[in-house]
Regions:
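Conserved N-terminal Rossmann-fold NAD(P)-binding element of oxidoreductases
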Residues: 4-11
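Hydrophobic/small residue at the entry helix of a nucleotide-binding pocket
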Residues: 12, 16
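Helix N-cap at the beta1-alpha1 junction of Rossmann-like dinucleotide-binding domains, i.e.
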Residues: 36-40, 105
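Rossmann-fold cofactor-recognition segment
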Residues: 48-60
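Conserved Rossmann-fold cofactor-binding substructure of NAD(P)-dependent oxidoreductases
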Residues: 58-70
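ADP-ribose/adenylate-binding Rossmann-like module
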Residues: 90-108
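Rossmann-fold NAD(P)-binding glycine/threonine-rich loop
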Residues: 102-124
């Protein structure tokens, strides 16, 4: 009986665990679900059987971790990204295949030779973004190359958004569908880098939310695309060393970025220092911390003046709706500006039970072939069922689950530290997502448009 150990049983495993559990008997697998919180592990697994069980674990306890991993065939690590190496080192020592949905770190890359020497697979970036974005992009790019095309332009965007039917009167047309902290801290990791028409381009952190691209995705409407931090790191992986334009980004509804930029300019997304005495502050007083002293003007007036926001601007209506001027108080004694903003936004941006989220992915590829310039737009939209069965959780967990099946069923897979960017990975994973789960892409040829 093949043994699978899942380490970390958070939101992203909501579809992963049922997929594996449904196949335990037919494939003769055993599933062990581990989490630092026993109740979380038990809740995620559901009823224990002779082929599945749950337990608590502290993965910083190397002895306990190795004990749990003994005689395991595949480990799936869904712990915070900075803790993957704890699991990776144990897997390497015990000769266990490892799968994660997280970005491939330099430290993980450094294990490549040792992983190959043991004929192991250490698969990373096999979720949604990163994950399905890589696989769908490489399917497009490989197909064009096989037909003799020379890639000149590649753009890719993904957004975790609200389904239109759940937007209601929410002026942001957005709620948290994933880790709120990551949303609040977005854009703070240094300058954005990409290539446009053969020129390297850079956007400093304070301008990330002012430089957006308008994108119309057929069937899903208009969006604004915000550049991801480093598109260039995928040049080699995508075999795009000579491409003229390479740009990866995030989708939001129009108007989101300008309003969010207000939080950035105020300093509310700063996570580098702590505000003391927050339990004595209202949200309104917190907002006033970032504005000049003027006892005669209201907080709203000072903010509009400081940020040069017109009275009737939809930016102001978004800020009011977000609750930064309310008299609610913080329940904690101290926190960074970013932590305080996250607390405020979670009150209005947490999904209600009936809310549906939506994933939208969009690729644009331009190439030359036989003296002609061609372009294809490829899009995918996928809606969740409700706040417990979200599109985000489904599309993050299922690729990993299918990849686990590929490893355990003896598919011909090359060893090493890798991403799912070869046909041996993206072929069967995308095929199953489309056939069984309706995660489908629609491609359309359009007139070539450069910059």
């Amino acid at each position: 009986m093949k043994r699978i150990v899942l380490i970390g049983a958070g939101l992203s495993t909501k579809s992963l665990v049922p997929y594996l559990k449904d196949r335990l008997e037919s494939h003769q697998w055993y599933l062990r679900v581990l989490d630092r919180d026993l109740k979380v592990a038990q809740h995620r697994l559901g009823e224990e059987t002779s082929q599945c069980s749950a337990a608590a674990i502290d993965i910083t306890d190397t002895t306990l971790l190795e004990l749990e991993l003994a005689d395991t065939d595949v480990a799936i690590s869904m712990v915070p990204a900075h803790m993957h190496m704890n699991v990776a080192k144990a897997c390497l020592k015990l000769s266990i295949h490892l799968l994660t949905a997280s970005y491939l770190s330099d430290e993980m890359k450094g294990l490549d030779q040792e992983v190959k020497a043991k004929n192991l697979v250490f698969l990373n970036e096999c979720g949604l973004d990163p994950g399905i974005d890589h696989m769908s992009a490489m399917r497009l790019l490989d197909g064009i190359r096989e037909d003799g095309g020379d890639i000149r332009l590649f753009e890719s965007f993904t957004g975790g958004l609200l389904s239109p039917e759940s937007e209601g009167d929410n002026p942001w047309r957005y709620k948290f569908t994933w880790n709120p902290r990551n949303v609040v801290l977005a854009g703070q990791g240094g300058a954005v880098k990409f290539i446009q028409e053969g020129k390297y381009k850079y956007i400093p952190p304070h301008m990330v939310f002012r430089r957006t691209e308008l994108i119309n995705v057929s069937g899903y409407g208009k969006f604004e695309g915000l550049a991801n931090r480093d598109s260039l790191k995928y040049k080699e992986a995508y075999q795009l060393e000579d491409v003229g334009t390479l740009y990866r980004g995030t989708l939001r509804r129009p108007g989101f970025a300008r309003a969010w930029d207000s939080f950035v300019k105020l300093g509310m997304t700063d996570d580098s220092y702590v505000i003391e005495g927050t339990n004595d502050l209202t949200f309104r007083e917190y907002t006033n911390l970032f504005l000049a002293y003027n006892p005669k003007d209201s907080v709203e007036l000072k903010l509009k003046y400081y940020l040069n926001i017109p009275q009737d601007s939809d930016i102001m209506s978004k800020l009011v709706w977000a609750g930064i001027f309310s008299d609610n108080k913080f329940p904690f004694e101290k926190g960074t500006p970013a932590q305080c903003l996250e607390f405020i936004l979670k009150r209005v941006w947490s999904l209600n039970q009936s809310d549906k989220d939506m994933i939208v992915m969009f690729h644009k590829v331009g190439w030359s072939q036989g003296g002609e310039l061609k372009m294809v737009e490829s899009s995918m939209g996928f809606e969740g069922m409700d706040s417990s069965k979200t599109a985000m959780a489904i599309t993050v967990g299922l690729p990993l689950a299918i990849a686990t099946k590929l490893v355990l069923t003896g598919q011909t897979l090359k060893p090493g530290v890798q991403m799912p960017i070869t046909k041996e990975w993206y072929g069967p994973i995308l095929d199953e997502l489309e056939a069984d789960f309706e995660v489908t892409f629609s491609d359309s040829m359009v007139d070539y448009k450069g910059y």
